[in-house]
């Protein structure tokens, strides 16, 4: 693989850019980027809203998810309810207080997306989307082949 391909796949540059873009949002609301990502995830995944769902979809370890949701509940960004079928499962829902944060987060992502793909033709963008989807499927397949020891 070429160096720039490795860099892109490792995500370092994109993570750094995202961190810089989100820094003012984090400071404004006194939240960490991971806290905001959890709120945004829950806004967009109202049916997949347990700690296990958050852990699996955001690739955050179980203990850290527990700490995050505890703090977000304490700060009135989340509410928690026991599952109807199984009371052991806690379901998290964002509160009204969260909407400004998730709206700003979406605006930042939209701007970032526009800037990242600036100057790229529609045809090249479609090719890129196909390649990214294939890579994503390959990664998912590889992850399913190996036991998860990092998030246990």
Task: Label the model's feature ranges.
Residues 1, 122-152:
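C-terminal regulatory/oligomerization modules of transcriptional regulators
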Residues 1-29, 75-77:
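N-terminal leader segment of winged-helix/HTH proteins
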Residues 11-21, 58, 101-117, 135-146:
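Alpha-helical linker/hinge and terminal dimerization helices associated
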Residues 14, 34-35, 50, 97, ...:
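N-terminal positioning helix adjacent to the helix-turn-helix/winged-helix DNA-binding module
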Residues 20-64:
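N-terminal helix-turn-helix DNA-binding core of bacterial DNA-binding proteins
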Residues 51, 69-70:
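Short, hydrophobic-biased segments on the C-terminal half of alpha helices
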Residues 70-130:
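Charged, amphipathic alpha-helical coiled-coil/dimerization segments
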């Amino acid at each position: 693989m070429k160096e720039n391909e490795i860099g892109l796949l490792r995500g370092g540059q994109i993570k750094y850019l995202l961190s810089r873009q989100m820094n003012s949002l984090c400071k404004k609301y006194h939240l960490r980027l991971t806290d905001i990502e959890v709120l945004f995830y829950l806004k967009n995944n109202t049916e997949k809203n347990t700690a296990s769902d958050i852990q699996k979809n955001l690739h955050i370890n179980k203990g850290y998810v527990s700490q995050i949701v505890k703090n977000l509940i304490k700060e009135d960004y989340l509410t928690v309810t026991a599952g109807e079928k199984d009371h052991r499962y806690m379901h998290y829902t964002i509160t009204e207080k969260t909407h400004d944060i998730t709206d700003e987060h979406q605006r930042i992502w939209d701007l970032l997306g526009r800037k990242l793909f600036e100057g790229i033709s529609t045809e090249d963008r479609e090719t890129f989307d196909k390649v990214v989807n294939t890579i994503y499927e390959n990664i998912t397949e590889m992850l399913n082949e190996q036991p998860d020891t990092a998030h246990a």
